[in-house]
Amino acid sequence: MEFAELIKTPRVDNVVLHRPFYTAVEGTLCLTGHHLILSSRQDNTEELWLLHSNIDAIDKRFVGSLGTIIIKCKDFRIIQLDIPGMEECLNIASSIEALSTLDSVTLMYPFFYRPMFEVIEDGWHSFLPEQEFEFYSSATSEWRLSYINKDFSICPSYPPTVIVPKSVDDEALRKVAAFRHGGRFPVLSYYHKKNGMVIMRSGQPLTGTNGRRCKEDEKLINATLRAGKRGYLIDTRSLNVAQQARAKGGGFEQEAHYPQWRRIHKSIERYHVLQESLIKLVEACNEQTHNMDRWLGKLEASNWLTHIKEILTTACLAAQCIDREGASVLIHGTEGTDSTLQVTSLAQIILEPRSRTIRGFEALIEREWLQAGHPFQQRCAQSAYCSSKQKWEAPVFLLFLDCVWQILRQFPCSFEFNEHFLIMLFEHAYASQFGTFLGNNESERCKLKLQQKTMSLWSWVNRPGELSKFTNPLFEANNLVIWPSVAPQSLQLWEGIFLRWSRSSKYLDEAYEEMVNIIEYNKELQAKVNVLRRQLAELETEDGL
């Protein structure tokens, strides 16, 4: 297919652009295979470049011969184009709808993007499982790398290389994979160097109504226990949902077969419940005419902060088991690709200072989201505005980022990255020039040859010029475990995501700049003080002689 076939009218003059916090701009609208571009006729610097893949929905309106297209973006922005001529307007709308809903992944922009910057580091090779294993192997010899999934035949949603107990061989892993949903046998997610406890993750066991068991599975997870110690099985589904799963061949670990493990059920919502929650929240945030009662009522009715609370509570529970109880943890829901990853990731941010650095957080996303098989292509296919909903779309990753922001807000000096870093990750998960978030798992990315044909997001982010934008000026390395509050009054709406297009951030930006300047000035003064102290010490030494 040629993009030209979908572009009926490639250029229209005298188009007026309306967008939040900008004055209206009149200019020339151009459509390319991947971008909608509007250039001002008065000011050459005034330009809008919008990826078609960032468009969630469009509305059309006509008054006489003047047409209006309202574009609703996946990053929650809403822009308006006033186009002279009904035919031109209909053609532009038709082209945008076609170009923003391309079926083939290989037609997406990352396959056509050619970076204008020098690649200092290839992000595709920055965070490999072998590197993570090396980090842990200095503290323990009880684990090994397994390449059993090197051709993705055991588990299509796992990477080729995983970390498993050394006492369990690959033949046993095959049997365990057959006993777990999607072949997702328990693998190491995190090793707590302080006491040797671990977090493992998997899919649900396929016990069914007959209570099927797998002795190799029991041996595998028992291999993580110390003598006389119990472990915790955290199921991210309610007991009722887990019991219903047995009728479909799924289920949960039977106490009789896992006597050393205590099972805890939490209730983290999935799929359409989360999607509906996002739709209600964005709708409430976009409505400018609410009185206080109506606004608070709509915010509460969205249940967004309730989902945040449930996820953070479960992550804190997992971290508590590891650090305070001295017990290992296995976490799963149904597939083990959504709520499971939210919990394992957030538990590591609580426990592990490395995950609160920029590179450590990037490694966490690679390891616990991309390599762990979170289906980004499906979950982020649409955002809050699209009417043609599919059952697999859900803001799982956005909820995770929101949870991280809640912790960052409570511990503003413990994170090397800032809020802009989290917002950037949200934007690129939904629409990007980079290939990092394409595909649903490593198997699909391998077939698409993303490493050879697209650029990694990390290659761009980790350049010194870009990193400075995402660095927290308040950061001071904190090697302690951090315990966020999950009390309702401690959780807030993330304005930087949900209100950034409905109210100006000008004064907040100015205050942030002023804070950065004060911190820099303070560092300069501290450096001068240190020099003067050294000089004073030298003079005192000379006088003593």
Curated annotation (Swiss-Prot):
It is a peripheral membrane protein. Homodimer. Heterodimer (via C-terminus) with lipid phosphatase MTMR6 (via C-terminus). Heterodimer (via coiled coil domain) with lipid phosphatase MTMR7 (via C-terminus). Residues 123-498 form the Myotubularin phosphatase domain. Acts as an adapter for myotubularin-related phosphatases. Increases lipid phosphatase MTMR6 catalytic activity, specifically towards phosphatidylinositol 3,5-bisphosphate, and MTMR6 binding affinity for phosphorylated phosphatidylinositols. Positively regulates lipid phosphatase MTMR7 catalytic activity. The formation of the MTMR6-MTMR9 complex, stabilizes both MTMR6 and MTMR9 protein levels. Plays a role in the late stages of macropinocytosis possibly by regulating MTMR6-mediated dephosphorylation of phosphatidylinositol 3-phosphate in membrane ruffles. The gene is Mtmr9. GO terms for molecular function: enzyme regulator activity; protein phosphatase binding. Its main location: cytoplasm. It comes from the Eukaryota. Gene3D superfamilies: Pleckstrin-homology domain (PH domain)/Phosphotyrosine-binding domain (PTB) (2.30.29.30). GO terms for biological process: endocytosis; negative regulation of autophagy; protein stabilization; regulation of phosphatidylinositol dephosphorylation. This is Myotubularin-related protein 9.
